[in-house]
A protein has these predicted regions:
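Residue-level signature of the cytosolic catalytic core of signaling kinases
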Residues: 49, 143, 183-187, 244, ...
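Nucleotide-sugar-dependent glycosyltransferase donor-binding/catalytic pocket residues
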Residues: 78, 93, 183-187, 215
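N-terminal Rossmann-like NAD(P)+-binding domain of SDR-like oxidoreductases, especially those catalyzing
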Residues: 1-178, 220, 295, 303, ...
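A glycine/serine/threonine-rich, flexible loop-to-helix segment
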Residues: 129-130, 185-193
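Short alpha-helix within the catalytic core of nucleotide-sugar-dependent glycosyltransferases
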Residues: 37, 42, 191-192, 223, ...
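Short, conserved catalytic or interaction motifs in soluble domains
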Residues: 38, 181, 242
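A generic structural signal for short coil/turn motifs at secondary-structure boundaries
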Residues: 181-184, 275
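C-terminal substrate-binding subdomain of Rossmann-fold SDR/epimerase-dehydratase oxidoreductases
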Residues: 10, 19, 58, 177, ...
Length: 318
């Protein structure tokens, strides 16, 4: 039996590295691709030397050459946190456009099925709640967050064009807020920001009045959803996330309680176009994939905080 080969872009990132682990575990030959713009080599260091893992350092916006057959391609390369895409706005747009074009071209050439990592940010600051796949969104295309939102919307449009015009097998996942080990403490999103401040004994910064909501999905649950979607026969976008919604203020209080810190909450100005609500409607994922999250927020947070404590104490563990 010939071992099937999988290419994962953004392999050294938070999500990409967990996907590498999953596909190696499932018996695939995994080719990880990353240029380390925001990815961390430590996330995949444990895979080096594994005969079922190969790494290519490469910018996905340039021509991608992979020798031999590919069964699947998972496109997860992109700056994904506000700090990164505000620092790297043009690169963010390029990876969503040029990078996606290169990936889809490779999928066409290899006759490979490709899964594209989109995001709940395609819904922008939503006027419908919770958000379901048929909602077209409320996005400011020229706002500071627009570089990420529109890159992902373009990515979806190009993916569907390749599916319809070139008959490429495509899958699109819309990922909602996800957390777990290998997140960067400095990536600017609520969870690592709150945990980092708490562990350093600093006050926790809540933007606005903290009434805005998010829904946090543990990374293992997300990876299971990605795996099931890839193997499904469905080509339109599918939401994968945890519908357990919480306000940012209550979330900050949870982090304070979990870390046992004496940190106080301080309020800061809400950034432009920051979504007021975010909650996935996962009816489609339940129906199509038999998927729903299994890991509670309390369980997932404990694992994640333990990971961050080791990082702060200078012990790298992946």
């Amino acid at each position: 039996m010939i071992q099937e080969r999988v290419l994962i872009t953004g392999a050294a990132g938070f999500l990409g590295s967990h996907l590498c682990d999953r596909f190696v575990k499932e018996g695939y030959k995994v080719i990880g691709l990353d240029n380390f713009l925001t990815g961390n080599p430590d996330n995949i260091a444990h895979l080096f030397g594994n005969p079922n893992f190969e790494f290519i350092q490469h910018d996905v916006t340039n021509y991608i050459y992979v020798e031999g057959p590919l069964r699947y391609i998972l496109h997860f390369a992109s700056p994904a946190s506000p700090i990164d895409y505000l620092r790297l706005p043009i690169q963010t747009l390029k990876v969503g456009s040029l990078g996606t074009h290169k990936v889809l071209g490779l999928a066409k050439a290899k006759n490979a099925r490709v899964l594209i990592a989109s995001t709940s940010e395609v819904y922008g600051d939503p006027l419908e709640h919770p958000q379901y796949e048929g909602y077209w969104g409320n996005v400011n295309p020229i706002g500071i967050r627009g570089v990420y939102d529109e890159a992902k919307r373009f990515m979806e449009a190009m993916t569907m064009a390749y599916h319809r015009y070139h008959e490429v097998e495509t899958r699109i996942i819309r990922i909602f807020n996800t957390y777990g080990p290998r997140m960067r403490l400095d990536d600017g999103r609520a969870l690592p920001a709150f945990v980092g401040q708490a562990l350093r004994g600093e006050d926790i910064s809540v933007f606005g009045d903290g009434s805005q909501t998010r829904s946090f999905c543990y990374v293992d649950d997300l990876v299971e959803g990605i795996y099931r979607l890839l193997l499904s026969d469905y080509s339109d976008p599918v939401n994968i996330g945890n519908p357990d919604e919480i306000s940012i203020l209550d979330f900050a209080k949870e982090i304070i309680s979990l870390t046992g810190t004496s940190s106080k909450i301080v309020y800061k100005e809400l950034p432009q176009d920051d979504p007021k609500v975010r909650q996935p409607d996962i009816s489609l994922a339940k129906k199509l994939l038999g998927w729903e999250p299994k890991i509670s927020r309390s369980e997932g947070l404990k694992i994640t905080v333990d990971f961050f404590i080791k990082q702060v104490n200078g012990v790298q563990k992946v």
